[in-house]
């Protein structure tokens, strides 16, 4: 941060001799501040619902740093009501800093990641349910935005189409018209499946690939010149950022040229500094897909706006490509991790369940 911010001078630090929690450090989630944030969110939910009566439940995943994503279960009494709710929440206090809002049905648990993936797969038509708001207020701490305090926002409507909506399979009201909508989006048929995952893995730029749902693919790739997670980067490297952009474009086009390309509505791309098949991979993936992603820079649509590419690779600082300095990740040494893991008090406790994965990682 280079602006005029308060400065705190620490003159002394005291702690218990055998402190269980010797420090508070914000870094790669889950961290203790995440659960404090969730507790605060629950306390203020009744106030939020009083002002926004359409809201059934709201969840700000700690994996996304709270300000990057909100999953909102919203009532649907009339067409497009969930979108109205999302727009209202973007004006609710510090929720104005949100990068993305996903609205789901009122009976859906917004903490259930499996249900969220199902909704994205079955209830989102890219052309009509993905809404970009340009030039909005951003969080000062969001390093991915090209301008301080300004970025584009994203609303994803993953709710069931109500019967009175012109996109439903019901007959329109007299004097009105129906809006052409795929039958799978109306909920009366299943969509075709993307079947070229093995061909994707053979693409030179792909390190690994994993299908999250029939129409949702995530791939990892190696980017040369990526800022080190330990040090970040304050040095502009225009050539490296240009190469990163070209690599993502090449990778996107290679995948979108496969035979079952029209069945792949969601394509997520991120760095290969994570194992897509490791334990709790999706928690790490949720963090990377939101913290490294800028809507204006990383969201791409095909010509017919039927497919979406979500570039969540780490941007490289560049003055010609509008990438600001990139911060380091708060990491811990192996010695510290081993010491904490061996602490006798920790054997008595487990991290509380935050996201529900239906028994899977």
How should these model regions be labeled?
Residues 1-361:
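Charged, compositionally biased interaction regions
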């Amino acid at each position: 941060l280079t602006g005029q911010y308060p400065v705190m001078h620490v003159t002394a630090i005291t702690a218990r001799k055998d402190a269980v929690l010797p420090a508070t450090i914000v870094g790669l989630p889950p961290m203790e501040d995440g659960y404090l944030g969730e507790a605060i969110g629950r306390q203020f939910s009744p106030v939020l619902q009083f002002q926004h009566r359409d809201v059934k439940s709201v969840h700000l995943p700690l994996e996304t740093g709270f300000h990057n994503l909100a999953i909102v279960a919203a009532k649907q009494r009339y067409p497009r009501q969930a979108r109205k709710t999302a727009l209202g929440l973007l004006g609710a206090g510090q929720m104005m800093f949100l990068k993305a809002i996903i609205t789901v049905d009122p009976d859906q648990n917004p903490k259930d990641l499996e249900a969220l993936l199902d909704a994205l797969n079955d209830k989102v038509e890219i052309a009509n349910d993905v809404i970009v708001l340009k030039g909005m207020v951003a969080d000062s701490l969001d390093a991915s935005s090209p301008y301080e305090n300004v970025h584009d926002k994203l609303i994803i409507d993953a709710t069931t189409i109500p019967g009175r909506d012109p996109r439903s399979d019901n007959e329109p009201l007299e004097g009105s018209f129906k809006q052409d909508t795929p039958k799978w989006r109306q909920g009366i048929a299943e969509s075709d499946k993307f079947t070229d995952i093995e061909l994707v893995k053979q693409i030179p730029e792909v390190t690994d690939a994993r299908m999250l749902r029939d129409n949702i693919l995530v791939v990892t790739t190696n980017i040369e010149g990526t800022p080190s997670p330990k040090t970040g980067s304050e040095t502009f490297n225009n050539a490296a950022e240009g190469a990163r952009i070209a690599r993502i474009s090449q990778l996107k086009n290679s995948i979108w040229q496969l035979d079952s390309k029209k069945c792949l509505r969601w394509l997520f791309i991120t760095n290969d500094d994570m194992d897509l098949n490791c334990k709790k991979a999706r928690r790490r993936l949720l963090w990377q897909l939101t913290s490294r992603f800028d809507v204006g820079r990383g969201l791409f649509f095909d010509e017919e706006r039927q497919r979406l590419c979500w570039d969540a690779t780490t941007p490289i600082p560049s003055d010609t490509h509008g990438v600001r300095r990139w911060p380091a990740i708060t990491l811990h040494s192996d010695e510290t991790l081993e010491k904490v893991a061996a602490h006798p008090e920790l054997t008595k406790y487990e991290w509380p369940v935050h996201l529900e994965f239906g028994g899977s990682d």
